[in-house]
């Protein structure tokens, strides 16, 4: 007789294991799935586990040459989503051997590579993942981390302040450098290349880096503070990207920048290793994230992309602002902000955290609040993000009616006033605007 029966097999038989006890070394994932009508939840969950690990749609001879029990993904729990008719959270455990060490690229190729186009599912979203220390320890993590960055910059006890230079496209390198100088001279810690600024015909990267470095050193000499500009090293090839990072280091600037989703995890980690070896801070922008994380029932939640960045490496990452959005968003945003900054984060479903995450000793990433913020948001931002964050303005600096430098002064005075008021025990939610009005009287 033949060894096994051909034909399409039920995934449930092998990949749905409700009695499985998860191991400390397992990579865990929580998927929000919307099965097609008529597909049972257990079958859909098992299909997700199978297709993102060892399974295929039929039994194959070569299955006998390995131990599937050791390598297969297991759907170990399914819970209906309250208030949704046909939605479930499927919990899947993967053995760590399925992912190459130190490769976010390979981890994602496994867990979210194929399965999102799966016919039996109407939609699928990766809501959260648990990275075990056994696996996270194979990653370098951020090149410096929060504490080392503060030590390098000699800035303590307050959020760091930045400003994206606008108009983002069209300025010449010389004028761009001038805007950088005015902002830094006014009191900001950092200025930033917009994520779209790479090396376009109106401003080639080398010219921009040079004029920006000049602005940095001039403003440093005049203020006695350490200044930085996120020079965007993102490029069309890894070699070109590293060439730009090398040039930045040769100029003696403290920080470079990368778009980690459009540039890709592989390029990002290569750049991070260079930064680690050469003492450069690495600022990460998340251009393209909304393509992946904006849909509520399909895609990947940003908290997973944030965890992936902490492993792939970066010292700063953009993480939304909360301000002016809904209250519910606040807890969710703070959930992944803590996943970026802290060592140990407890499971807390109200903040969207499905698993307890222990980063052990991996350095933290500074969350960057950017997008439409200005001085009147300061009390709220100080309260929400605390000291370990970067507050990133744009129009909120350069839109000041008196010019860029006064805009930067205002940006610096407001958070310092808020931090002082908070430290004196005043309630920022109630007295914040008053605090800023008071401070403005003494601001030049």
Swiss-Prot record:
Mg(2+) binds at residues 192, 194-195. The keyword Lyase applies. CDD domains: RuBisCO_large_I (cd08212). Heterohexadecamer of 8 large chains and 8 small chains; disulfide-linked. The disulfide link is formed within the large subunit homodimers. It comes from Botrychium strictum. The disulfide bond which can form in the large chain dimeric partners within the hexadecamer appears to be associated with oxidative stress and protein turnover. This is Ribulose bisphosphate carboxylase large chain. It is an enzyme of class 4 (lyase). The gene is rbcL. Its cofactor is Mg(2+). Its EC number is 4.1.1.39. Belongs to the RuBisCO large chain family. Type I subfamily. Binds 1 Mg(2+) ion per subunit. It is found in: Plastid, Chloroplast. The basic functional RuBisCO is composed of a large chain homodimer in a 'head-to-tail' conformation. In form I RuBisCO this homodimer is arranged in a barrel-like tetramer with the small subunits forming a tetrameric 'cap' on each end of the 'barrel'. The lineage of its organism: Eukaryota, Viridiplantae, Streptophyta, Embryophyta, Tracheophyta. The modification N6,N6,N6-trimethyllysine is found at residue 5. Its main location: plastid.
């Amino acid at each position: 007789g033949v060894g096994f029966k051909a034909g399409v097999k039920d995934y449930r038989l092998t990949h749905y294991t409700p009695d499985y006890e998860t191991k400390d070394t397992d990579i865990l994932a929580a998927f929000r799935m919307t099965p097609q009508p008529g597909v049972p939840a257990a079958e859909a969950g098992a299909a997700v586990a199978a297709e993102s690990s060892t399974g295929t749609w039929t039994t194959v001879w070569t299955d006998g040459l390995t131990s599937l029990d050791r390598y297969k993904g297991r759907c170990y729990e399914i819970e209906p989503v309250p208030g949704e008719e046909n939605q479930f959270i499927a919990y899947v455990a993967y053995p760590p051997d399925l992912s190459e060490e130190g490769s976010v690229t390979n981890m994602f190729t496994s867990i979210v590579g194929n399965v999102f186009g799966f016919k039996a599912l109407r939609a699928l979203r990766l809501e959260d993942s648990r990275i075990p220390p056994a696996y996270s320890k194979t990653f370098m993590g951020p090149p410096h981390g929060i504490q080392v960055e503060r030590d390098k910059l000699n800035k303590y006890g307050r959020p760091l302040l930045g400003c994206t230079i606008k108009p983002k496209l069209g300025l010449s390198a010389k004028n761009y450098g001038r805007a950088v100088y005015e902002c830094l001279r006014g009191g900001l810690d950092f200025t930033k290349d917009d994520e779209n600024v790479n090396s376009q015909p109106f401003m080639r990267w080398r010219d921009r880096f040079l004029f920006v470095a000049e602005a940095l050193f001039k403003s440093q000499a005049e203020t006695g503070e350490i200044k930085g500009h996120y020079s965007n090293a993102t490029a069309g090839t890894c070699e070109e990207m590293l060439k730009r990072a090398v040039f930045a280091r040769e100029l003696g600037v403290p920080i470079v920048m990368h778009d980690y989703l459009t540039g890709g995890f592989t390029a990002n980690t290569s750049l991070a290793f260079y930064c680690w070896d050469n003492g450069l801070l690495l600022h990460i922008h998340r251009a393209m994230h909304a393509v992946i994380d904006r849909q509520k029932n399909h895609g990947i939640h940003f908290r997973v992309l944030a965890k992936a960045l902490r492993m792939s490496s970066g010292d700063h990452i953009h993480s939304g602002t909360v301000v002016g959005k809904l209250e519910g968003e606040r807890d969710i945003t703070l959930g992944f902000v803590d996943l970026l900054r802290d060592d140990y984060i407890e499971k807390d479903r109200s903040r969207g955290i499905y698993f307890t995450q222990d980063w052990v000793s991996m350095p933290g990433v500074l969350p960057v609040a950017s997008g439409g913020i200005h001085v009147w948001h300061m009390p709220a931002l100080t309260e929400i993000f605390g000291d370990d964050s970067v507050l990133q303005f744009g129009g909120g600096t350069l839109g000041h009616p008196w010019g860029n430098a006064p805009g930067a002064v205002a940006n610096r005075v407001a958070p310092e006033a808020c931090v002082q008021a908070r430290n004196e025990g005043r309630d920022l939610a109630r007295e914040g605007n008053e605090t800023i009005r008071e401070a403005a009287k003494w601001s030049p």
